[in-house]
Regions:
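Sec-dependent N-terminal signal peptides
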Residues: 19-28
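Extracellular ligand-binding/catalytic regions of CAZymes and related secreted enzymes
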Residues: 37-45, 68, 202-208, 215-253
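Short, solvent-exposed loop/turn segments at secondary-structure junctions
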Residues: 50-51, 101, 128-129, 194-197, ...
Length: 253
């Protein structure tokens, strides 16, 4: 064995150890993402709008969980909380459940600016993607807009895709509204569904996002489209896990 080969022989175990160490760090970092809590994070929960989506039930369920995380919670059942930009920047995460409703230009601008500058935003169903239909700057920030739910409530499958937020989660066979979306190609889709031809033959086989995450400036956005009845997240535990993981992911570090 020459000196070069002798040196390489002793170096190989070191290289292998480094590779294993990097791999271990990656695994631990992924696990830490799931074990992180929202302790001492400033969370704003905003609810209201169309009562058919039971926004208070959604807010109550979320607030109960946030308390278990020892988060600092501010609750608002109107959009006046969006009046002041400086106040919004004090929050680490905004969880919104407001379907339809009207938002002023100032309120929409403040919200979008706050997300752009690092505040996170997350939500479910129409509480995030069927809000403020006339405000395209809001839609641009969220990454999508509800446009239809063919057949109303139907049975369909939510397919979990390969992502750290979906690790260990199973596909969900669910009975609820299957949201048809207009969405930004820039979103990172982490769960999807496939439409059939039962109600509109021309959408047969269309693959549609059910959950996504995205960046907007310095802020992060998480969305999941199930939850017409907020208690679906209780009946389908993997849906709840994905929702709460999304909250943690979107929250400002």
């Amino acid at each position: 064995m020459n000196k070069f080969h002798e040196f390489d022989y002793y170096l190989k175990p070191i290289k292998i150890k480094k590779v294993l160490l990097v791999f271990l760090i990656l695994i631990l970092s992924n696990n830490l993402n799931f074990s992180q809590s929202l302790e001492n994070k400033n969370i704003l929960v905003v609810w209201g709008g169309w009562k058919g989506h039971q926004p208070k039930v959604f807010a109550d369920n979320v607030i109960k969980w946030l308390k278990s995380q020892n988060a600092k919670i501010t609750e608002s059942n109107n959009l006046e909380v969006y009046d002041n930009y400086d106040s919004l920047t004090k929050f680490d995460l905004i969880i919104q459940s407001v379907t339809l409703s009207d938002i002023s230009n100032n309120q929409a601008d403040n919200l979008v600016k706050a997300i752009n500058n690092g505040v996170g935003i997350a939500g479910a169903h129409g509480g995030l993607t069927d809000s403020f239909r006339t405000k395209t700057n809001y839609q641009f920030m969220i990454g999508g807009q509800f446009v239809a739910h063919p057949g109303g409530k139907v049975n369909f499958e939510v397919n979990m895709l390969n992502d750290q937020l979906t690790q260990g989660l199973n596909n969900i066979e669910i009975f609820t509204e299957q949201y048809y979306m207009h969405f930004d190609p820039n979103i990172e889709i982490i769960a999807n569904t496939i439409f059939d031809n039962k109600f509109y033959p021309w959408i047969d086989g269309v693959i549609m996002p059910v959950a996504w995450k995205k960046k907007y400036g310095k802020g992060k956005v998480f969305y999941i489209s199930i939850g017409h009845d907020p208690n679906e997240f209780i009946r389908y535990p993997d849906g709840w896990k994905l929702l709460t993981r999304g909250f943690i992911w979107a929250c400002r570090n």
